[in-house]
Amino acid sequence: MAKQVFQTTFAGRELIVETGQVAKQANGSVVVRYGESTVLTAAVMSKKMATGDFFPLQVNYEEKMYAAGKFPGGFMKREGRPSTDATLTARLIDRPIRPMFAEGFRNEVQVINTVLSYDENASAPMAAMFGSSLALSISDIPFDGPIAGVQVGYVDGQIIINPSQEQAEQSLLELTVAGTKHAINMVESGAKELSEEIMLEALLKGHEAVKELIAFQEEIVAAVGKEKAEVELLHVDAELQAEIIAAYNSDLQKAVQVEEKLAREAATQAVKDQVTAVYEEKYANHEEFDRIMRDVAEILEQMEHAEVRRLITEDKVRPDGRKVDEIRPLDAVVDFLPRVHGSGLFTRGQTQALSVLTLAPMGETQIIDGLDPEYKKRFMHHYNFPQYSVGETGRYGAPGRREIGHGALGERALAQVLPSLEEFPYAIRLVAEVLESNGSSSQASICAGTLALMAGGVPIKAPVAGIAMGLISDGNNYTVLTDIQGLEDHFGDMDFKVAGTRDGITALQMDIKIQGITAEILTEALAQAKKARFEILDVIEATIPEVRPELAPTAPKIDTIKIDVDKIKIVIGKGGETIDKIIAETGVKIDIDEEGNVSIYSSDQDAINRAKEIIAGLVREAKVDEVYRAKVVRIEKFGAFVNLFDKTDALVHISEMAWTRTNRVEDLVEIGDEVDVKVIKIDEKGRIDASMKALLPRPPKPEHDEKGEKSERPHRPRHQKDYKPKKEFTETPKDSE
């Protein structure tokens, strides 16, 4: 295929697509240039159907540091495991693509996005999402696209598509919306307490922009697209399916309607085990035994899926007996753990999350060194999902993509209400431990996080609560569900998570299994979520009505002082010698930023006070008219040098030592003496003159002696430097002889 170039303008930037030049052995590949960001996307498909009961789709987003003209960090100086941002971007691309493959498609598909050049004002993630859809669409891989995505901002009351970095910093909204030309199928957002109306407007305007990108893709597919390959889809034997449904559907229906999760799982598993045993015996010697048993398992899964959906859409009954807009029983607890800086335990039905707060000096912030300029991350929210939370055994190790994604969602939801660094100069870490799970564990972690922050004395602007909404859609009819449990998530069509305060939304996340949802469904889901959010906030506020006024006794206390920027090097000292000495002497932790803000941390207030005193002394400046208790450190003929404080000395001239005349400095002071002095002058070079006599009472002028007679002592005329007293002669001058 010869190289072809397609070009348009989108959101004020050039969008160029090149095909037929690179990565030609992949099923489909494109180079997308958006502004000065360049992304290569290659899509490949395995030749055979994979084993397993899921579609093996892998989407990667690979950040090459050379794209931003940077060296990778670390000893190896080579890219290693994906960054958190890269992992989140890969998930962002995976989620709108996954629903666009046919039911039963089991061939492995990999979509690899490589960032080759990076322009911080032209979104590389959105270029990668565009490239992923286009590479699949022009390939022979059976993909029912195209899809596209855009970023949406909200600045000065205006919706902005693909905002620049400067606009993004000012924006009250950080939204990514993706979909087909007919409907939205993925949402990811953080927001500064925006209303449902503004969020809906942003979603719909974002979708209008998505349609533009899809039209451009369709033009390219028409020009260079390949014919789609014929692949085998997983299907079950129709006669076997009819036989099992007729014999066991009523048993499975009863099992599905058991309200308690573990009892329901046991009941449904008992039916499945019974059916499996029957057919294992029946087809034990059949040459296609493995295929038949795979079909039996798939048929039973389909039967359970169909019954759950029928109950909700036709009978308006949920598996646990709730109404469609009813929340499971709620419980909130603070101070679940001693010694920690704050803790909250939140339970919703059989979903339970424990959140633990840790406060630390700003030196503990996370340094993020990716394609963007390096920055420090002050707030971290980590989410852990152990297998025991669902009563199973399984893998333990580093967090997977799901845990990273759920942690990031909670982080966005809670970050919007955190105090500023000036108000609360701490690094903040929340860890959510999911102790039980039956759906919506990420939203439980947000609620538990609010409890931990409030109990720990972090002055958040308002409590945040989260709720997960579901959808069962059957043709033209649909049912929106409040607070979905695991079964409804598994067999439903949508998982729409909404978090926020009473004043507005702080985070959204939507994943769907169908190809899109309408504005009508979005509106209804947002309205139901708001009602549910307020119910949860009632429970949180009843448990802890307001943020505690003080930090936990075990949390590090903090004091701050401001120093001149040019004094920072004095506090740090050569090679950190001075600051290390202060830390060793007092046991505190000290952080100094580039603006001269010094933060001192310790659990011991006396230690903080001592460190603060030392630092204040190091950067202290003498001021005219201030009085100091000084120590004589050097004596010269013309005066004495005294140490005012630390490394600041002043000269007390001999004439400023006393009101009476003296010829020798040593007659008044010796080295080591402590004297009170007053600063009388600081010249342009910073040299300080001080006076002792300025603090002494001025003696009266000696105009008369004790008898009241006028003194005969000659007066020294003022302002005559060379004046000498007249000499009194006692002998007759020689000239008179």
Curated annotation (Swiss-Prot):
PROSITE patterns, per database record: KH_TYPE_1, S1
State where composition is biased (Basic and acidic residues): 700-737
Q: What GO cellular component is one of the record's annotations?
A: cytosol
Q: Which intervals of the chain are annotated as region Disordered? A: 691-737
**Which N-terminal stretch is annotated as signal sequence?**
none
Q: Outline what the protein does.
A: Involved in mRNA degradation. Catalyzes the phosphorolysis of single-stranded polyribonucleotides processively in the 3'- to 5'-direction.
Q: Which reaction(s) does the protein catalyse, per the Swiss-Prot or TrEMBL entry?
A: RNA(n+1) + phosphate = RNA(n) + a ribonucleoside 5'-diphosphate
Give any GO molecular function from the UniProt entry.
RNA binding
Q: Which organism is it from?
A: Streptococcus pneumoniae (strain ATCC BAA-255 / R6)
Which Pfam family, just one, is annotated for this protein? Answer: S1
The identity of this protein, by name, is: Polyribonucleotide nucleotidyltransferase
What cofactor requirement does the entry state? Mg(2+)
Q: Where, per UniProt, does this protein localize?
A: Cytoplasm
The family this protein is said to belong to? Belongs to the polyribonucleotide nucleotidyltransferase family.
> What range(s) does the KH domain occupy?
556-615
| GO BP of this protein | mRNA catabolic process; RNA catabolic process; RNA processing
Instruction: Identify the residues that the record assigns to the S1 motif domain, covering every copy.
Output: 625-693
InterPro entries attached to this UniProt entry: ExoRNase_PH_dom1, ExoRNase_PH_dom2, ExoRNase_PH_dom2_sf, KH_dom, KH_dom_type_1, KH_dom_type_1_sf, NA-bd_OB-fold, PNPase
Superkingdom, natural source: Bacteria
| Annotated binding of Mg(2+), by residue | 489, 495
Keyword annotations: Cytoplasm, Magnesium, Metal-binding, Nucleotidyltransferase, RNA-binding, Transferase
**EC assignment:** 2.7.7.8
| CDD domains for this protein | KH-I_PNPase, RNase_PH_PNPase_1, RNase_PH_PNPase_2
Q: Does the keyword Nucleotidyltransferase apply?
A: yes
